[in-house]
């Protein structure tokens, strides 16, 4: 699922080329009703839900605090935080329904572990994702649902590209999203092997 149709079609084609069964649907993660629709379509297509990966994110508020607007903060809260909340709220009951356990994988950021200047809303919302993930890991343990949170550093995404032009120091630090990094490899292995994070 993605709000960007071009990215959605690219991901669908890549997965289908690997022989993976695919359901591709447009999703604005900040809309709980859209999450419910996606969940219903996924259950119809696959029979049950085992995992949800919350990977949406927006930068929104780049700049000094005195120039930041409420709208930028609200956008970051809606996408980066509430998108994760809605994803779990809608999918967890469906994972619990089959009684086999499952996974919630939330993608936060190293920015959520410590402040990156001029990115207050991004830092704050990603820190909230880390805290939620830790809370949910305890809350859902008895149901056999594992919760992992990934905190990548700079990855070459649209957020990175918009910041790169403004912040020279980022240029040599970004991960290439087409190459498997150590954190994504570890996450993939945990899920494949059923190892707790």
Regions found by a protein language model. Name each.
Residues 5-6, 26-37, 70:
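The beta1-alpha1 cofactor-binding region of Rossmann-like NAD(H)/NADP(H)-dependent oxidoreductases
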Residues 63-65, 69-74:
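Substrate-binding pocket helix/loop in short-chain dehydrogenase/reductase
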Residues 65-66, 114-121:
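Active-site loop immediately N-terminal to the catalytic Tyr-X3-Lys motif
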Residues 88, 125:
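Active-site helix of classical SDR
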Residues 93, 138-139:
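Alpha-helical segment proximal to the catalytic Tyr-Lys
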Residues 109:
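Residue(s) in the substrate-gating loop at a strand-loop-helix junction
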Residues 142-197:
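SDR active-site lid
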């Amino acid at each position: 699922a993605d709000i960007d149709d071009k990215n959605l079609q690219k991901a669908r084609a890549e997965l289908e080329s690997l022989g993976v069964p695919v359901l591709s649907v447009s999703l604005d993660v900040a809309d709980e009703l859209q999450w419910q629709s996606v969940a219903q379509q996924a259950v119809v297509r696959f029979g049950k839900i085992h995992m949800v990966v919350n990977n949406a994110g927006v930068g929104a508020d780049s700049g000094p605090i005195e120039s930041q607007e409420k709208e930028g903060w609200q956008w970051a809260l809606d996408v980066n935080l509430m998108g994760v909340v809605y994803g779990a709220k809608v999918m967890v009951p469906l994972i619990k329904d089959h009684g086999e356990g499952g996974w919630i994988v939330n993608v936060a950021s190293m920015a959520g572990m410590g402040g990156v200047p001029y990115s207050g809303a991004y830092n704050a919302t990603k820190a909230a994702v880390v805290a939620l993930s830790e809370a949910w890991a305890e809350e859902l343990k008895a149901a056999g649902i594992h919760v992992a949170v990934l905190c990548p550093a700079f990855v070459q995404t649209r957020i990175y590209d918009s910041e790169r032009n403004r912040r020279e120091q980022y240029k040599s630090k970004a991960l290439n999203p087409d190459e498997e990094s150590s954190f994504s490899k570890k996450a993939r292995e945990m899920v494949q092997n059923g190892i707790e994070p």
